[in-house]
């Protein structure tokens, strides 16, 4: 994608819009994690259970200083994209959703990393209504969401062998719970 596309994505997000874009794994619907109205728009468009949290994508571990080492370690050592669940610290209610933890993932996708470096962390649930399978291409995403999404960014077809990220929680004793 061109610099113009990057600018279009960041402008859309900064103005409260939501964007369907390929992540490290599958297509996601992204919105600024700091924008409550945009986050709620994603929930409405996906018809997502309001009590379910979304993974927060970050460009680097310094975005979460209290847990930077843990997030960095698992992002670098796991072979597949891995979201790490850590205790919530000062995240807003529209992110924690009544819970006491948050899942963060350092993105590997270069375009998405550039976007996040410019606008800050984004939520990124899969690009599908709650009861449907994730979109594997932009045409499927458009069928699901139509004009309710502000911008679609075509990242090609997602191979059937690619699935959503692994989600882990590191327990106080150092053992790992594989949540997905």
Which residues does each predicted region cover?
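Active-site-adjacent structural elements in enzyme catalytic cores
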Residues: 1-180
């Amino acid at each position: 994608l061109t610099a113009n596309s990057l600018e279009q994505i960041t402008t859309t997000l900064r103005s409260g819009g939501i964007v369907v874009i390929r992540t490290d794994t599958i297509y996601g619907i992204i919105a600024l994690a700091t924008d409550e109205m945009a986050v709620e728009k994603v929930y409405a468009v996906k018809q997502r259970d309001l009590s379910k949290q979304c993974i927060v994508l970050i460009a680097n571990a310094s975005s979460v200083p209290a847990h930077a080492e843990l997030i960095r370690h698992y992002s670098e050592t796991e072979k597949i994209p891995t979201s790490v669940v850590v205790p919530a610290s000062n995240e807003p209610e529209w992110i924690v959703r009544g819970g006491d933890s948050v899942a963060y993932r350092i993105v590997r996708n270069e375009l998405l990393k550039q976007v996040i470096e410019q606008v800050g962390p984004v939520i990124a649930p899969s690009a599908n209504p709650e009861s449907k399978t994730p979109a594997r291409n932009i045409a499927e995403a458009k069928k699901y969401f139509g004009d309710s999404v502000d911008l679609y960014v075509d990242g090609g077809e997602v191979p059937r062998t690619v699935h959503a990220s692994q989600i882990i929680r590191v327990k106080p004793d150092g053992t790992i719970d594989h949540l997905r």
